[in-house]
Swiss-Prot record:
Places the protein is found: Cytoplasm
Main location: cytoplasm
UniProt entry keywords in alphabetical sequence: Cytoplasm, Ribonucleoprotein, Ribosomal protein
Entry-linked InterPro entries: Ribosomal_eL18 (IPR000039), Ribosomal_eL18/eL18-A/B/_CS (IPR021132), Ribosomal_uL15/eL18 (IPR021131), Ribosomal_uL15/eL18_sf (IPR036227)
Protein's gene: RpL18
Pfam families registered for this protein in UniProt: Ribosomal_L18
Molecular function terms from GO: RNA binding; structural constituent of ribosome
Name assigned to this protein: Large ribosomal subunit protein eL18
A single BP term in Gene Ontology: translation
Length: 183
């Protein structure tokens, strides 16, 4: 007797191409697809995979977090590579000099990085400077920093659950339904 093999769950769930219609993003995908194929570097494969990702999976990273990553003594003179957005952080008083390659940098973050004597690269410039990812550090923002993530997890009433409930209001009058429904 043979075994009936169920192929129900066989497909690999991952993006194989970019979903966005942004022509500039598609050009970058073309470039990094070529680099991933022709170079033997894992770096290009990772960048390509991250270019495919949705906006939710490409979270922004603040200048302060970037500075904290690049301040380490082993990372001096390296290029910080962010497949996403670099945002400003007013809480950070002084920004160290650093080289950043990112998909997008906000106006204020750009001004502050350049004022500190730093440099901002685009991904096509990065491909010319470091085609195999030598002297680079891949960094990304926190994916679970979104407010929506607080609602995920075991049900809000369950024991040891810290999940945030979906409620319209905290007011006791509106939230509680009428008790006299069966009269």
């Amino acid at each position: 007797m043979g075994i009936d093999i169920n192929h129900k769950h066989d497909r690999k769930v991952r993006r194989t191409e970019v979903k966005s219609q942004d022509i500039y993003l598609r050009l970058l995908v073309k470039l990094y697809r070529y680099l991933a194929r022709r170079t033997n570097a894992k770096f290009n494969q990772i960048v390509l995979r991250r270019l495919f990702m949705s906006r939710i999976n490409r979270p922004p990273i603040s200048v302060s977090r970037l500075a904290r990553h690049m301040k380490k003594p082993t990372r001096e003179g390296l290029i910080a590579v962010v497949v996403g957005t670099v945002t400003n952080d007013v809480r950070l008083y002084k920004i160290p000099k650093m080289t950043v390659a990112a998909l997008h940098v906000t106006e204020k973050a750009r001004a502050r990085i350049l004022a500190a004597g730093g440099e901002i690269l685009t991904f096509d410039q990065l491909a010319l400077r470091a085609p195999t990812g030598k002297k680079t550090v891949l960094v990304q923002g926190q994916r679970n920093a979104r407010e929506a993530v607080r609602h995920f997890g075991p049900a809000p009433g369950a024991p040891r659950s810290h999940t945030k409930p979906y409620v319209r209001t905290k007011g006791h009058e509106k939230a509680r339904p009428s008790r006299r429904a069966n009269v």
